[in-house]
């Protein structure tokens, strides 16, 4: 590798940060995302993208159904600069029915921001997503939101995180008051109080007054009771709380905690500044040839998301690529690990929700969009130089099943195309009956809303109305060893055998009891709630 390229890669990695936000629905994720973009200069007013009509819709919620319902149902990538750093914000679905899409997004993230509602504390979806971060070893930064509303005591919230998640906590800032009495936050590192003025509905950057802790004006600006409460809290934190240890943070054992209000912009910029200082830079990725450092001179990356029809005018399909190593350049030739072919990466795009612009280069930590004419699948690796392949992204056990019918034979081509493209992008898992006479696809989902999205998009994007027939199953298990292992068992009862999109056998059960009964009768049968990962395997066409 040339010294010039080595220096270029080191500098690029140094200036990049990459993170996803995880939260329970209604914790304020979309609002926090908007405010981070506001401070990053990517938008001038929260809810309106720079150079776009003032539609006042959330920047990250671009899909028609999202804007109709006011919920986030698909992950997007939002890229912006702040203090010379290139930040890739991997926005995840806020609705719990789309946790699988969130998991795929976390595969591309170096850090996670755990957003918590101060009134509610830890909630079920947050706990689930924390476990995913823990499995992947992703550092977690906590932002406790909605301090401008009545909520639980800050010390109680820290204790809940420590007791339930097993994480040490370090409060980087500390709230002064809560609800109507919320006055700002205290920066423990700089020993400064940030007193905030409310901006117009939080749509503009908040102006704050910074006062040193020993400044005599503090008692004038704060109610006496709040001032003494702050002093007592700080003494307690210093006396019993741990010191900040960035090694523990990067190992996922300690979480820096920030308090604020995304709606009114309190504490958002302070969080962003410290996040850039503390967060992991793009690091090594495990591959078929071992760990590969981001400064490895050859280019490599993997597909973590596919999205069809981001631009309905052009009926396009985009593959989201996380750059892992080396330098990406427009029109470069790369090896496609799964299909074993050389392909040209033309028309690369920088992504900003639905907005896109052409780019010429990208570096480790960046996410780029590539037009996807049926070449890419989720989990695919592309590379130059020595052959390598990154770990695939597994599918998880769905809990709801339904047969999808097309009542209009004249729309069969559009129906098949729509189902195939939605399957490829992971909108829902698709399975098929082993009975060749039954051609209707079986949708397998984590939540009911996934079914609604599939039907909505088939009609909105492909012009196909469909009929959904719910099936009486709630448990799916993949058979380890495939069809051969299943044939050795012989005839089995109280289960239905189907095949997934890769042609692998899956057993569907009405309940967990039926599943356990089968395992009791056939202990030699090995079942898995997670689909085996074979990134080189091709989907079957039905």
From Swiss-Prot:
PROSITE patterns: G_TR_1 (PS00301), G_TR_2 (PS51722). It is found in: Cytoplasm. Keywords: Cytoplasm, GTP-binding, Nucleotide-binding, Protein biosynthesis. GTP binds at residues 23-30, 91-95, 145-148. It comes from the Bacteria. One of its GO terms (molecular function) is GTPase activity. One of its GO terms (cellular component) is cytosol. This is Peptide chain release factor 3. The gene is prfC.
């Amino acid at each position: 590798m040339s010294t010039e390229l080595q220096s270029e890669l080191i500098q690029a990695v140094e200036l990049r940060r990459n993170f996803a936000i995880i939260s329970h629905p209604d914790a304020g994720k979309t609002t926090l995302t908007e405010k981070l973009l506001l401070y990053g200069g990517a938008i001038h007013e929260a809810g309106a993208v720079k150079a776009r009509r003032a539609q006042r819709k959330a920047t990250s919620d671009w899909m028609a159904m999202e804007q109709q319902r006011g919920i986030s149902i698909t992950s997007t990538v939002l890229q912006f600069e702040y203090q010379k750093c290139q930040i890739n914000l991997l926005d995840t679905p806020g609705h719990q029915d789309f946790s699988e899409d969130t998991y795929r997004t976390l595969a591309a993230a170096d850090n996670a921001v755990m957003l918590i509602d101060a009134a509610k504390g830890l909630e079920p979806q947050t706990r689930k997503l924390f476990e995913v971060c823990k499995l992947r070893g992703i550092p977690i930064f906590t932002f406790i939101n909605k301090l401008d509303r009545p909520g639980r005591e800050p010390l109680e919230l820290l204790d809940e995180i420590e007791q339930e998640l097993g994480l040490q906590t370090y409060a980087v800032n500390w709230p002064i008051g809560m609800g109507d009495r919320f006055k700002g936050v205290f920066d423990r590192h700089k020993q400064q109080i940030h007193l905030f003025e409310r901006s117009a509905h939080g749509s503009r950057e908040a102006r704050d007054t910074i006062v040193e802790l020993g400044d005599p004006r503090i008692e004038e600006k704060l109610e006496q009771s709040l001032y003494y409460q702050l002093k007592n809290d700080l003494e307690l934190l210093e006396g019993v709380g741990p010191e900040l240890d960035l090694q523990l943070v990067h190992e996922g054992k300690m979480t820096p905690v920030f308090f604020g209000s995304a709606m009114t912009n309190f504490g958002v910029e302070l969080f962003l500044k410290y996040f850039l200082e503390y967060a992991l830079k793009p690091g090594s990725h495990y591959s078929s040839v071992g760990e590969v450092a981001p400064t490895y001179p050859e280019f490599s990356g993997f597909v973590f998301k596919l999205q069809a029809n981001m631009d309905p005018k052009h009926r396009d399909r985009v593959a989201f690529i996380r750059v892992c190593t080396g330098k990406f350049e427009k029109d470069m030739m790369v090896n496609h690990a799964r299909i074993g072919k050389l392909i040209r990466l033309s028309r690369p795009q920088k992504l900003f929700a639905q907005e896109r612009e052409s780019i010429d280069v990208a570096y480790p930590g960046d996410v780029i969009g590539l037009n996807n004419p049926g070449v890419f699948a989720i989990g695919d690796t592309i590379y130059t130089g020595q052959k390598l392949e990154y770990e695939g992204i597994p599918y998880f056990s769905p809990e709801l099943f339904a047969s999808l019918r097309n009542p209009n034979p004249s729309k069969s081509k559009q129906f098949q195309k729509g189902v195939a493209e939605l399957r490829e992008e992971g909108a829902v898992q698709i399975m098929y009956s082993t009975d060749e006479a039954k051609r209707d696809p079986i949708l397998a989902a984590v939540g009911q809303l996934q079914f609604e999205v599939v039907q909505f998009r088939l009609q909105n994007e492909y012009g196909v109305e469909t009929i959904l027939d719910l099936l009486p199953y709630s448990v799916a298990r993949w058979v380890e060893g495939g069809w051969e292992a299943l044939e050795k068992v012989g005839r089995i009862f109280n289960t239905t055998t189907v095949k997934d999109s890769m042609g692998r056998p899956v057993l569907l059960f009405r309940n967990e009891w039926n599943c356990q009964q089968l395992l009791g009768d056939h202990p030699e049968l090995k079942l898995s709630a997670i689909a085996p990962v074979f990134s080189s395997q091709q989907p079957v066409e039905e």
